[in-house]
Amino acid sequence: MLKCIPLWRCNRHVESVDKRHCSLTAVPDEIYRYNRSLEELLLDANQLRELPKPFFRLHNLRKLGLSDNEIQKLPPDVANFTQLVELDISRNDISEIPENIKFCQSLEIADFSGNPLTRLPDGFTQLRGLAHLSLNDVSLQSLPNDIGNLSNLVTLELRENLLKSLPSSLSFLVKLEQLDLGSNVLEVLPDTLGALPNLRELWLDRNQLSSLPPELGNLRQLVCLDVSENRLSELPTEISGLIALTDLLLSENLLEILPDSIGSLKKLSILKVNQNRLVHLTDSIGECENLTELMLTENLLQSLPRSLGKLKKLTNLNVDRNRLSSVPAELGGCVSLNVLSLRDNRLGKLPPELANATELHVLDVAGNRLQNLPFALANLNLKAMWLAENQSQPMLKFQTEDDEQTGEKVLTCYLLPQQPSSSLENLLERSVDEAWPTDTNLNRVSVIQFRDDSKHEEEDDETAADKRGLQRRATPHPSELKVMKNVIEARRNEAYTARPDEDLESPDAEEKRLSGLSNQSHDSQASSSTTSATSHEDKQGINSTGVELNDGQVQEEEDLDEMEVEYTEPTVHFAEEPIIRGGDEDDDYDNDDDDAERSDEVSQTPSFPAEKQRLIRKDTPHYKKHFKITKLPKPETVAALLQGFSHDGLSPTAHTPENERDGEDDEEEEEDEDEEDDLHTPFQHRLDAAELEDIRMSQMNSSLQPVKGVSFDQVNNLLIEPARIEEEELTLSILRQTGGLGISIAGGKGSTPYKGDDEGIFISRVSEEGPAARAGVKVGDKLLEVNGVDLHGAEHHTAVEALRNSGAAVVMTVLRERMVEPENAITTTPLRPEDDYFPRERRSSGLPFLLDPDCPAVSTGPAQRLATCLIRNDKGLGFSIAGGKGSTLYRVGDTGIFISRIAEGGAAHRDNILQVGDRVISINGVDMTEARHDQAVALLTGTSPTITLVVDREQSSVGGASPRTRPHSPPPPEPSDSPEQEDGGDEHLGNHLNCPMEDEYPIEEVTLIKAGGPLGLSIVGGSDHASHPFGINEPGVFISKVIPNGLASQSGLRVGDRILEVNSIDLRHATHQEAVRALLSNKQEIRMLVRRDPSPPGMQEIVIHKQPGEKLGISIRGGAKGHAGNPFDPTDEGIFISKVSSNGAAARDGRLRVGMRILEVGNNSLLGMTHTEAVRVLRASGDSLVMLICDGFDPKSASTIEASPGVIANPFAAGIVRKNSMESISSVDRDLSPEEIDIMQKEVEMVRETSQWEREEMEKVSLSSGPLKLDYKTLAALPTTSLQKVNRASPSEPFRIDSPVRDAAHSPHNSQSNIHFPSNANTKDNASTKPGAIQPLSRVRPPVSPASQDGHSSPNPFQHGLSPINSQTTDLYSPRNNVSAKQPSPETPSPLGRHSPEQRSFKDRQKYFEIDVKQQTPDKPKPRISLVGEDDLKKMKEEEAKRIEQRAREFMLDEDEEEEEEDLAKQVAHMKAHGKVVLDGVEYKVESLGSPTSRQCATPPNYSATPPSHCGSSGPSSIDGKGDSQRNSVEDSFRLEQRPNSMTGLIPVYPGESAAPIRTAKAERRHQDRLRMQSPELTVALDKELSPAEKRALEAEKRAMWRAARMKSLEQDALKAQMVIAKSKEGKKRGTLDQLSESPSPAPTPSPTPMEDISPRTVTSPGRLSPGAADDVHFMDESSSNAVSVIDPEVPVAATSALEEMALYSNKRKLRQGRRSLEAPVPT
């Protein structure tokens, strides 16, 4: 029998080892210790060179990973791996696969890729189980001819080999679904390839195929066919048979035509025919109704078929680099088309019908010959329109004009008409992309010249340049900018001398001017301006890195935080009538491209000859602003544009943190720095001197204007006269302080102008708190004089020196511009209200709103009209607006525009006139009473440095509070399907449905100044993320953690604050990632708008101090990505307290309760943490625990929900989800200190040695057949409450285990969940109680689980979750687990008082506890290490057998036998009738395993904590013999007194004291029978009459009386048995627990080895345990015994019920030896 006892250490039961990326040079020796259990070994990515002999003794390996090593040889011993299923030896140096691999018949997945193999062994094709074979990049030159024998292959990868042909037997692989033959040298394919009926993917790319076999058309299941990069000149017509084909890749072949049969591919979704020789595209392409992507790049197509218009699902059409001269009008029928690329063709015109493709977002027509664009394209929502190869912005501004030939209205811009691209001539030789210079060195070609291919040879260069040549510079390198600046200056001087007073040009000159304009690289520098479409070299020059005079202050990048009006409505605006500029304007235009944008400042010019008037573009948008071509704009928007919005990308006021230096010498390259700043500040503007010239020009020509101030053009574009700008000289005195003046300057003679062409010195930056700011210096002031030094016409360095040498007192004279109202304010109304539209994207203008507390309608009280003029500073205007037509109303019933917020410290705040709630009447003279919100935004974000506002203030207005008062922000609007709610960004921001709630929570603006460190906060929530416990009814982004003394904490932020905005970015509806990005933006200053939402209910911080050695005593449930801890909200990922132990610091503290939510532990926020992480944090908390908690859920309500019939309380337990329950509930009291662990390990070692001896003794004394009798000493010493019975399942309902389950093997939780160490264990005190295998029954009714209500196991045991007893009912190593059995819980008694063995004779009781120890013969016996010699063992067995038989005869002849058998027969019948039994005064409910109502697995009570699979466990079965590899079976088996045995079929109750004294077991039985006959419910009442102490005293008294009667008669036999055991112990070192073996174990019930880990655990939902259930687990008193269970590991689970077993014992039958099937009733 010793061969069945595993004598190796229990920690050697390991199933999986992962040693990847461990830099191993040899296989670790420890792995060989696991040779009997190891199933998965991963040694990938190490430096192994060889595999030693012992490695191949790991016979049970099922998965072996050795990839990415340096293994040079695979030994033939690999044949030992007969169980191997998955083998990965890819990327090694193995040159040959051994022939013996054919013996690995279990192999299903093999990867040999990346080895220098040249052939496969002959026996390789015998691996008939192989399903997935990878042989990529192994230099194979041929495949075995019999490869068809691998009939189960599903995937075959042969990429990057040297295969020239394929064997015909390949057609036998009928299960093959994926065949990859890419990157070989195949020249022809076998016809048999078409005989693979299940083939779904066929990869033949990068071969040398010149044709495809027609049989390929038989592949009816084929989904993807890739034959790109071959030599195909045609496709077979049979390709129409590929009816399931979705992807057809034909790139880089020699195809000239596609077969008409391609139209039969109805499921075709992607067709790529790029880089072929197609000259014609078949009309049948239109029949491919599911086609979404059609790539025809680089062919010879001259036209497209009209049938393309039938492709309603086509989203991407690319016909770049062909020879198209026209596009079919039917293309507009492609209603789903998103991207249309026609680059580098010969198109002269686009059809207007393209506008019908309403989903078109990107149109690329660069490199064509377009004269103009159809006017209908204005209706498209384009995001990108590419007209030139080096166009810097995706969108341009267009104007309308009449086509000279057709008279139709068309669109044009400065890039039209197009110049033909030279790449057309090189179409077949190279692509434009390849010709594009990619080098970054300074010698690269910086000029790209385009010439007309037909005429440039005949014309001289100058003529060609004037008429045809478009010379465009490539994007300059910063080092080139200085040189370019000088060139620009020369050009500017030439321009001034050439045309000083010219008023207008001839048409030829105009054309030359426009060509010259194009010559100056409008678009080559995308980064130099935020909003202009062109970028002149002088602007590029500005881009060189420079530094600012920063006075030691950190410069900050910020996007107009106070002025939160960010975007105008993204539209492209057109003026039908050209606006011609003459005179100085033309000089400006020619010399500075940005003036091309600013030309819109002129409202009307004198009438000029209109024969060839050219259009001037307006306001090209920056690609970041979501501008797109759309419907014609509202005239008010155009008014705003003409008013001053047209050049909003140039700001003098931005700051960057780069290149900071102290001292004024930083000013030298100030202009460069400022221009760079514009990249980050698209809405900070400046007024150019060019604008002044424009305005002066318009004033000079005012007599020529037919209408003063306003006019309309033919497309209803409202043209408004801009406000006048006056200049005034100011003298300011500054007292210098240490650190500088606090200003930066830009400009100067010879430097890039700061404004237009004005080469004066300008103030480009003013530090807020600096001396200059206090003296009144403002950004944009022109510096005329410093301390008497005249700076008119001075160079930059002269000004720097003047400022540097100015001393402590600086007197400077500046020229400042101010806005003057236009003479006639114009009221505008929408001319075509039907054109209202809302852009598709939500704009992020972030306008906060004030909400009146009572949401009043428009007040009719007296109004006070106020006017103010605000000067835009570096942070904008400093206020926000809300309301307007088409937007969310600021006040109910009032469509007006109101001041909704005033930024503290901003321009409006310092002006101290505007107040929150003021109604805006006009902006810069434009009436706003009936205006839309976006129109007001457009006016406010114009480039004008001053904004004149007229507002009305109601005397009783709530908004009339101090401007310092932080206005409230409304809650997010309700969901709506209306376009206003769906599309409008600004319109989203004020919803007043919840106005009363809004005022309850104050709103504050908090500014965080980054100092290089973190912000000190964490957030939770977002539109795509749960934000529990914050904002459950109103989702949003919340602060979930504030680090003490961090930046956020110092700024007053607290946990629970709702973040409404960050740097003007609205986060009310933002996703979590958007909020994170906003907070992590590269800004020095983070401005946050937060709403002080109330804290979650019950939020408090508690501090718990643990006493030395004391455990915290709580269990938790929930966590992210796991099972929800809140039974009322499945989306709640919070961490909740699921249990508070009665023994622990938490219970002593008294403030923690079940159901509470834990927000923080120490400084660690648990929000968003997984369950495992939360457990780890709690365990690492130390002796002093600081917790932030709040109310969670009501455990009483939760228990009612979970106990409801028909409700699956936990999907894991019900087998719905395969999940480890440890992820849902864990005790936090599991970590031990290293010292404690060391002590525990020593104890385990002792227990292990003892258990091995005990097993031997069990075999010696049992002889595998006879029942083992208990000696009287053991029976007398052990209290009867500690005796346990091994339950047997009834034969009629067999114990079922469907299949071995190993899922739990890899759970890190399982490895801990079953470790049960008793606290304060003192084995020395147990001398009076010989350690044995008797275990106290848990006096707790196990919680029922719905999992097993069907009475049988799930057909698929993998669907069962782990039974959670091990994880939820025990807090390991916790004192609360050692609850004394003297304290039964009053909650647990069950109304079941029944028979008690206390009335039986002692002999009968002893027979009742006899255990048959049966041998279970394994299929493949494994060698066991015997610690006892064979001779001694044989003698001991014989002696013990004689004694046992003698004792059996004596007991059979006992005088009371017949009477007891009669009583027992009655008792068995009664127990069967009532299903209950009383043992030792404890009543048990006997449940049959197979019954439909059974809710527990009736497994032996002291089996380990892993149940058979039918109990809902993913643990191992006893049949399989292989268990949870990471489970510590020592603790499972030997610390069972710690474990509640709630899985037994016996449910204890406690009968009360009877009225009359009972002194025998029979008398007690008779009394209980009487009680049952009278009133069964009395058992509960009687049980409650006695206190626990009284019950124990009564039971002890009865036991003492019953024991005394039989002690003498057994004394002799017991002594003899102990002598035999003592003899076997001689010479052996005895551990503390070696006394276990001194008496034969009275109840050697099986405590399995790890391979037979069947546990008594209830199948209870994790987290669904009733709150007190775990506390009601009672154990034997610590002083009574420290017993451990020791068993024969091969004992099968008996399949008879406890009732039948009692009958068996009474009849003295012996159960048949041998292995019993768990699938059928066990014969008796």
Swiss-Prot record:
Residues 1430-1461 form a coiled coil. InterPro entries: Leu-rich_rpt, Leu-rich_rpt_typical-subtyp, LRR_dom_sf, LRR_R13L4/SHOC2-like, PDZ, PDZ_sf, Synaptic_Scaffolding_LAP-MAGUK. SUPFAM superfamilies: L domain-like, PDZ domain-like. Residues 451-484, 496-620, 646-683, 955-995, 1283-1407, 1414-1433, 1449-1468, 1488-1555, 1621-1684 are annotated as: Disordered. It is a peripheral membrane protein. Gene3D superfamilies: 2.30.42.10, Ribonuclease Inhibitor. Residues 1-821 are annotated as: Sufficient for targeting to adherens junction. Residues 518-534, 1507-1518 have a biased composition (Low complexity). It is found in: Cell membrane; Cell junction; Cell junction, Adherens junction; Cell projection, Lamellipodium. Palmitoylated. Residues 731-818, 867-955, 1005-1094, 1101-1193 form the PDZ domain. PROSITE patterns: LRR, PDZ. Keywords: Cell junction, Cell membrane, Cell projection, Coiled coil, Cytoplasm, Developmental protein, Differentiation, Leucine-rich repeat, Lipoprotein, Membrane, Palmitate, Phosphoprotein, Repeat, Synapse. GO terms for biological process: activation of GTPase activity; anterior/posterior axon guidance; apoptotic process involved in morphogenesis; cell migration; cell population proliferation; cell-cell adhesion; commissural neuron axon guidance; convergent extension involved in gastrulation. The keyword Transferase does not apply. It comes from the Eukaryota. Residues 574-583, 611-620, 1295-1306, 1395-1407, 1521-1538, 1623-1632 have a biased composition (Basic and acidic residues). GO terms for cellular component: adherens junction; basolateral plasma membrane; cell-cell junction; cytoplasm; lamellipodium; membrane; plasma membrane; postsynaptic density. The modification Phosphoserine is found at S1609. Residues 1308-1329, 1346-1357, 1364-1385, 1490-1506 have a biased composition (Polar residues). Residues 554-567, 584-598, 661-678, 1453-1463 have a biased composition (Acidic residues). Disulfide bonds: none annotated. It holds the Pfam family PDZ. PANTHER family: DISCS LARGE (PTHR23119), PROTEIN SCRIBBLE HOMOLOG (PTHR23119:SF57). Scaffold protein involved in different aspects of polarized cells differentiation regulating epithelial and neuronal morphogenesis. Regulates the caudal migration of the nVII motor neurons. Required for convergent extension movements during gastrulation. This is Protein scribble homolog. It comes from Danio rerio.
